[in-house]
Structure formats: C-alpha cells, structure tokens
C-alpha cells in the first residue's frame, strides 16, 4: 500500500464498497456525535466522509484531531446509512470507517477558517493566502484559471501560432507607466527594467522573420491597483502576426476568445460574430470607448432639436451656444416609475458634478405621443416627437438628457445609460457580449499646450495614404485631426480586454507621425533608436494584440475583483503581506550594488 494514499478524497464510489483504502488530507470539518466522530477529509480532488467510534483502536488519536490538521487514515469503504447520503458530493453515497489514523501535520489556531463562507478583511486573507486558497470557491477559481490558460495555448497553437519566451530583464522604455528597476551588480550605476509588456521584443520577433508569435506573458507596471487590474504584475495573451491587415488579426483572435468563453461560460451565451463599432459611434451611442452591449439602451444626439428656435429651454440653449451638445438617454418602460425614481437619478447626476438630468416622460393621449415632465413645457410637441424618434422612445418610456461639452456630455450620458439600465434591470446579464472598437483618432488637439498631440498609440499605422501623409504640413491641421489609426480594442461586457494595432513599420512614416506631434527625430532616436534601427533593415507589415489573461479569468469566474483569480496577489499598495515584500535590502547587498539610500523624511 502506498505510504500516503490509495485513492484521493474525491475518488470513492459505491463500486469501492468493501475495499480497504488509505486516504490523506485535511480535516475539513469534525463532528462529535457522542462516541462517534465524523471527519470530513479534504484534499485537492474532493471530500470524503470518514467515521470512527470508540471500538476503533484509532479513536483516541482521532479525538486529538482539529480543523485543518493533515492526517492519514486507513479504513473500509461502506455505504452510508439510508437518509444520510449527500447528493451534492460525488462521494456522498459512501463513507470510510477508520481503522488506523496518523497525524501528518498538526495545525495551530487558525487566523482564517477554511470551512464556511465568512468574509474576512483583505489584510488577513492576503497574509494567510495559503489558508484562503484552501477555500472551495477560491481553489476552484485558480484551477479554472489554469484550465483557461491551457485552452488559450491550445487554441493559439491550432491557429498556427508558435509560443516564444522574451526577456524578463530588459531596458527601460517609456510606455506610460513607471518601470520596476533592477540594479546591476556587474555594471555599477546601471539598471535593468522588468518589461511593462513584451511590445518591442514581439515586434523584433516579426522583424527576425518569424510569422505568428504568442506568449502568456508576465508584465510589470508600477501603477496603482484597480478592481480589474492587479498591482505590480499581470499576465496577457501576447500576440503578433506578420503580413496582416487589421481584419486578419480579428479573424485570428475571434475564434480563440469565442472558443474559450464558450468552453467556460457555464451556459451563458457568447457573441458569435463580434460587431465592429467605430470609436466615434461608441462615444456617441454608449458614452464610452468600451461599451457594455448587454445594456440595450443607445444614446442619441439631440443638439439640433434643442437648438431649434421654437424650444425655450434656456439651460440647454446656453450650453449649445457655448459649443456644447445635448445627448438623450432612453429609459425603456420608465413612465410607470414613481417620482422618486427620477429624483434619485437627478441626485446621482448632481453627485457626478452635473446640475442634474432633465427628462421627458412619454405617454399616449388621444392616439398621439405626449411628453410630460419638468422640461416638456419648454418644448413644442413636434420637437418632442423628433426627440422621441431619435431616442427610440415610445409611449411608456422616458428620455433623460445630458448637456455640456462633447466630452462631458458623453461621459455623463454613458454613466447614466449604465445607471438607468441597472435601475430598470434592462441588461441581459446571461451573456458575454463582445465587440471591436475601431477607427481611433490618430491625433487630438491639446488645448492646454495649444498643439496637436497623439490621441492613443503613437506606434500604430495611420489609416491614410502614405505619400499624402508624408506631405502634410502645419496648414493641414484639420486633415491631421481627422486621421484615423489602425488601432483597435476588444471589449467584453464593458471591460476592455486589450488594445491592439497594426504597427507603424515604416521609419519615414514614424518620423513624420512624431514630427506632427512636435517630437524631433533626435527624441525618436534617443528613446526608440533600437527599434528604429531594426525597422530600417527590412521590417514586414505586422500587427497584434494582447488580451489580459487576468481579466478573461475574472469574467469567466464572475468575480468583481481580480484578486479572486490570482494565486498570490499583492494588496492595493503593492505589498505582499505573506512574504513581506517589498523589504529593506541588507547593507551588504546595497554595497555590492553600489547603492546609497536617500530616503524621504518620515512625516509626523
């Protein structure tokens, strides 16, 4: 017989009745029924009920066992008495009568109970993460994460991609966030950086002549934590392809994501064909560049309607005269809501810094659509009808309004759309709704510096005739601000899984792109000289994307916080409470690295 087990704690079935078995695991729960002890023994694979009474020679040893002690038991498998079966357990129709018991690992007083679903402070959970991970739900999340990553890898290989590994110690690059720096002992005063992403390496892999790259890549960024972003490090499905258009990238990525989500969706529907939504349409219709398509409400622009001379609502008139816009957010079926519903939404809008949300409630009177509400009296019936038509409203619906600069109106309308959809329970949450957001602007006007600046990714290829782009001058500001980039985002349920782009592989186009934004060739050479040199030596057209693995797992595990799908996460301050990181270096380590500390004075 094996030293520790003949079966796992999830393996025994009625066909095993009568066998002598050996199990090892943790005491999940112990129940004392007056001379009879029931021990639920748990391991990675499941849970088995074990029974011992005073007739067993191992009874005294069993009486000493406590929760989370690790024990080994020998015993006979028997059928549970009628009426005591547990249909929720695969092993629930059998139990093991204990003949022998050995304590393999006793446990002290637990700072965090494993049995039950009690909520404990984040600090306690992270400090004793190894205990937290014994809990069924979190344990299942981590196993599901591994299965999802296996599925991603398999689907990428089936799509003709090859897995590469890129360096972890590399050079610092200005990619938006702060780098984590690693001092070099061999080169005093010099530092490596942990990669914020393998961006340059994956492009260099294409320039090196490889065709389809992928990697489950660790990325390191010294930035603040969010619910959907783990501090310090995260993983992404890094993808790059040569000789491809934007549509080729979409066709390669969609089957992978759709397949993985269908595999792990627990019966939820998954978008079959991912719709393409332009950035301009996303900002107009949804108020954000990462729309949640589970919500059916679509925002409409009604600036022209409120600008009509027949409209007497001065608040919106003033906004429009100042160059602002008015957006309409439909609220399906809201006409039947009490006044408190509308007051509550106005209070919410004021908490967002807006004066409120004007609204019209549409009802049918005498066969005609009639608007009621605080601002309806300022708007003639024919204009009300136009507003209802644009907003897709009918009798029984309401329409709310957000006014301000284009950016502020879009932001408020986007938040109001989500809020209204949630309040009225309009969203179809039984699905994973994907979309691509495309046609991002290449440039935008920087009002503060009075100059043209990059809007998003400066290294994406402009969607513009190359010769015409190279010929653009200062007098072509309007044309420049209208240029779109071959840049795209993949969004699921309102969460951005990734940005991607067709890369700017032409040095002449890249130099021009940076010159338009006010960056000289010297700046480009200084910051990205290595990449430019590679591009000058025969670079193929290439593009890619990098969906976030942690966010994918978070969605599929239906967890609101990324911490619940990461094995050993840091806290919000990027501290590992379990291992005590970051920690002070010893004087010897600092001397070897030629580092002298200049710490800020402690406050107070």
Swiss-Prot record:
Residues 199-202 are annotated as: Aspartate. It comes from the Bacteria. L-aspartate binds at residues 175, 221, 456, 503. Its EC number is 6.1.1.23. The record marks 33, 83 as: Important for tRNA non-discrimination. Keywords: Aminoacyl-tRNA synthetase, ATP-binding, Cytoplasm, Ligase, Nucleotide-binding, Protein biosynthesis. GO terms for biological process: aspartyl-tRNA aminoacylation. GO terms for molecular function: aspartate-tRNA ligase activity; aspartate-tRNA(Asn) ligase activity; ATP binding; nucleic acid binding. It catalyses: tRNA(Asx) + L-aspartate + ATP = L-aspartyl-tRNA(Asx) + AMP + diphosphate. It is found in: Cytoplasm. InterPro entries: Aa-tRNA-synt_II (IPR004364), aa-tRNA-synth_II (IPR006195), aa-tRNA-synth_II/BPL/LPL (IPR045864), Asp-tRNA-ligase_1 (IPR004524), Asp-tRNA-ligase_1_N (IPR047089), Asp/Asn-tRNA-synth_IIb (IPR002312), AspRS_core (IPR047090), GAD-like_sf (IPR004115). ATP binds at residues 221-223, 496, 548-551. GO terms for cellular component: cytoplasm. SUPFAM superfamilies: Class II aaRS and biotin synthetases, GAD domain-like, Nucleic acid-binding proteins. PANTHER family: ASPARTATE--TRNA LIGASE, MITOCHONDRIAL, ASPARTYL/LYSYL-TRNA SYNTHETASE. Homodimer. Belongs to the class-II aminoacyl-tRNA synthetase family. Type 1 subfamily. Aspartyl-tRNA synthetase with relaxed tRNA specificity since it is able to aspartylate not only its cognate tRNA(Asp) but also tRNA(Asn). Reaction proceeds in two steps: L-aspartate is first activated by ATP to form Asp-AMP and then transferred to the acceptor end of tRNA(Asp/Asn). This is Aspartate--tRNA(Asp/Asn) ligase. It comes from Methylorubrum populi (strain ATCC BAA-705 / NCIMB 13946 / BJ001).
């Amino acid at each position: 017989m094996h030293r520790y087990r003949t079966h796992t704690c999830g393996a025994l079935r009625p066909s095993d009745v009568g066998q002598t078995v050996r199990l090892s695991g943790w005491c999940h729960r112990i129940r004392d029924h007056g001379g009879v002890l029931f021990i639920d023994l748990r391991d990675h694979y499941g849970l088995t009920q074990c029974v011992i009474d005073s007739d067993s020679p191992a009874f005294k040893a069993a009486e000493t066992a406590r929760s989370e002690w690790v024990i080994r038991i020998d015993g006979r498998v028997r059928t549970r008495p009628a009426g005591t079966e547990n249909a929720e357990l695969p092993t629930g129709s059998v139990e093991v009568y204990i003949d022998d018991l050995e304590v393999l690992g006793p446990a002290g007083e637990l700072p965090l109970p494993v049995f039950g679903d009690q909520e404990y402070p984040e600090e306690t959970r992270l400090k004793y993460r190894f205990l937290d991970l014994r809990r069924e739900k979190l344990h299942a999340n981590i196993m599901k994460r591994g299965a999802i990553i296996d599925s991603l890898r398999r689907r990428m290989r089936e799509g003709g991609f090859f897995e590469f590994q890129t360096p972890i110690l590399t050079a610092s690059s200005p990619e938006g966030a702060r780098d984590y720096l690693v001092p070099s002992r061999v080169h005093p005063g010099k530092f490596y950086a942990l990669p914020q992403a393998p961006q340059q390496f994956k492009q260099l892999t294409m320039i090196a002549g490889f065709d389809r790259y992928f990697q489950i890549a660790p990325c390191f960024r010294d930035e603040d934590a969010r619910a959907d972003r783990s501090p310090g490090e995260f993983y992404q499905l890094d993808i790059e392809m040569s000789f491809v258009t934007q549509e080729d990238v979409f066709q390669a990525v969609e089957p992978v994501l759709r397949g993985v989500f269908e595999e792990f969706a627990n019966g939820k529907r998954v978008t079959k064909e991912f719709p393409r939504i332009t950035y301009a349409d996303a900002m107009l219709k949804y108020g954000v560049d990462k729309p949640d398509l589970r919500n059916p409400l679509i925002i409409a622009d009604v600036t022209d309607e409120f600008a009509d001379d027949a409209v007497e609502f001065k608040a919106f008139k003033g906004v429009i005269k100042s160059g602002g816009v008015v957006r309409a957010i439909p609220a399906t079926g809201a006409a039947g809501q009490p006044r408190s519903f509308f007051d509550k939404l106005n209070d919410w809008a004021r908490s967002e810094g807006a004066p409120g949300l004007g609204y019209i409630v549409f009802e049918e009177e005498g066969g005609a659509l009639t608007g009621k509400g605080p601002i309806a009296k300022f708007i003639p019936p024919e204009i009300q009808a136009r507003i209802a038509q644009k907003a897709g409203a009918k009798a029984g619906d309401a329409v709310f309004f957000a006014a301000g600069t284009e950016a502020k109106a879009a932001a408020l309308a986007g938040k109001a759309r989500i809020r209204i959809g949630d309040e009225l329970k309009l969203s179809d949450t039984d699905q994973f709704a994907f979309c691509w957001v495309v046609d991002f602007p290449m440039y935008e006007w920087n009002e503060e510096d009075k100059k043209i600046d990059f809007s998003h990714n400066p290294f994406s290829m402009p969607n513009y005739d190359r010769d015409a782009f190279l010929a653009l001058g200062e007098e072509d500001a309007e044309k420049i601000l209208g240029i779109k980039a071959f840049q795209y985002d993949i969004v699921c349920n309102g969460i951005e899984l990734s940005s991607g782009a067709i890369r700017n592989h032409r040095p002449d186009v890249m130099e021009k792109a940076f010159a338009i934004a006010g960056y000289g060739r010297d700046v480009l050479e200084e910051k990205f000289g290595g990449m430019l040199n590679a591009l000058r030596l025969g670079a193929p057209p290439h593009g890619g994307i990098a969906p976030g693995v942690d966010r994918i797992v978070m969605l599929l595990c239906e967890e609101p916080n990324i911490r619940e799908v990461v094995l050993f996460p840091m806290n919000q301050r990027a501290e590992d409470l379990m291992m005590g990181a970051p920690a002070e270096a010893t004087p010897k380590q600092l001397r070897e690295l030629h580092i002298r500390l200049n710490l800020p004075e402690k406050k107070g």
